[in-house]
């Protein structure tokens, strides 16, 4: 099999290969912090029973599940991802938890298959850095969220603390691929993940991108010395 030629093909290849070890590696890479980041973000979102959400690049479904538990049986959550293997893990979790309000869809974040103004919330967790075009996906999420709704992104960021920054880059460049090789047998795939994290915009740059996509207001929150950040974009009420 030849080397994937585009970013989209390369990312698809990565996640189709690491899906079975993704959850355990995610916990190791973030020192278990990703769960607390998502929990804090959910608190800030204040999701209510009966509401609707779309989780873009849902992967193995952890954020989709948190959203499903928040909206309850009267709400609706759709988790969308382009990796069928990642979705297979999410489907097993859904079945185990009997979450009838959760629907899992194989689809493309660059062309969301939904009408304008469809969801109260649209989320993307650690997926934006992997899409071919950040702005296209932000504009798509803006399009499908309802007026007065929120688009929320949790993503790796560029640390600003002196010393912390150097340690972060060392960890991502040298340690993470080795962990990937030892645990997931996937050195090349985890090398890609550190590349995508290194090249991703800082939190201020991402805030500007949210505003350029049309959002009326954007809130930011840094986590763990700036290694990750939450951006919450508000779509103006009509």
UniProtKB/Swiss-Prot annotation:
Q: Which NCBIfam families match?
A: MenG_heptapren (TIGR02752), MenG_MenH_UbiE (TIGR01934), PRK00216.1-4 (NF001243), PRK00216.1-5 (NF001244)
Keywords, A to Z, come to: Menaquinone biosynthesis, Methyltransferase, S-adenosyl-L-methionine, Transferase
Q: A Gene Ontology molecular-function term?
A: demethylmenaquinone methyltransferase activity
Q: Which residues bind S-adenosyl-L-methionine?
A: 60, 81, 108-109
What EC number(s) are associated with this protein in UniProt?
Answer: 2.1.1.163
Record gene name: menG
- Pfam assignment, any one: Ubie_methyltran
- This chain's protein is named Demethylmenaquinone methyltransferase
Q: What does this protein do?
A: Methyltransferase required for the conversion of demethylmenaquinol (DMKH2) to menaquinol (MKH2).
